[in-house]
């Protein structure tokens, strides 16, 4: 069972609880048994947390949010199979190198071809991965803000976890956390940011810490074209609890 299937199943659980239509093609990517196991807690989550009811599912095509709620509010839904862990933002969280650098070109005018020429590097995935590492570490506050917007730019955020056990079976005891009213932008203090790797020692993964709290992980895949960043949700909860987000 992969993470995408669990995430889509969580969306289906919400949609089916409140009779919101989901396209058959999208529905086929979920798992009915997982959706049913999550459905048990959905209504209580919405009621206890006073979340407006969903009226439209819009998660297809990498939309940054998953549901339109009553009063035109928005809801994003994420999940982990087991304990709270790493989750990628939409659109820019796990793109190919082509998509990533096209995004940088559109948003910031960063030209990957010009940068490769400046560094006298061939246009290969390995070279692009190196530029990704350099750009991420040199512009971490800016990129963190981008990742934050594509992850939390919503009125309500639900995160389901403890859905499956370590053998891939249903726990029948899914858990959920809810966040709302998060800042649209976060002022990241560069003095509080650290990495577990340097550009030169970074092979595949590089953990990002804020005030010594692990809040995310960069990953450069060796066997496929993917430049990934995922937030550590447990770490984000610690930042919120300690009032380190502003």
Show the residue positions of the predicted features:
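Short, positively charged
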Residues: 1-65, 69-73, 79-246
């Amino acid at each position: 069972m992969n993470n995408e299937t669990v995430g889509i199943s969580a969306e289906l659980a919400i949609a089916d609880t409140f009779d919101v239509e989901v396209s058959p093609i999208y529905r086929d990517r979920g798992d009915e048994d997982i959706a049913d196991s999550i459905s048990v807690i959905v209504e209580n989550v919405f009621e206890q947390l006073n979340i407006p009811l969903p009226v439209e599912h819009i998660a297809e095509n990498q939309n940054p949010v998953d549901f339109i709620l009553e009063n035109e509010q928005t809801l994003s839904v994420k999940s982990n199979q087991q304990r709270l862990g790493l989750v990628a933002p939409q659109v820019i969280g796990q793109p190919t190198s082509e998509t990533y650098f096209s995004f940088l070109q559109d948003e910031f005018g960063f030209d990957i071809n010009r940068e490769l020429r400046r560094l006298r590097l061939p246009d290969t995935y390995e070279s692009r991965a190196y530029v990704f590492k350099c750009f991420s570490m040199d512009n971490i506050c800016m990129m963190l803000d981008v990742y934050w917007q594509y992850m939390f730019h919503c009125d309500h955020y639900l995160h389901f976890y403890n859905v499956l056990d370590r053998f891939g079976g249903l726990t029948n005891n899914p858990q959920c956390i809810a966040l709302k009213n998060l800042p649209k932008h976060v002022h990241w203090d560069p003095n509080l940011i650290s990495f577990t790797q340097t550009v030169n020692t970074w092979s595949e993964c590089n953990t990002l810490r804020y005030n010594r709290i692990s809040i995310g992980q960069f990953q450069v895949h060796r066997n496929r074209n993917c430049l990934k960043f995922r937030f550590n949700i447990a770490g984000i909860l610690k930042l919120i609890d300690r009032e380190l987000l502003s």
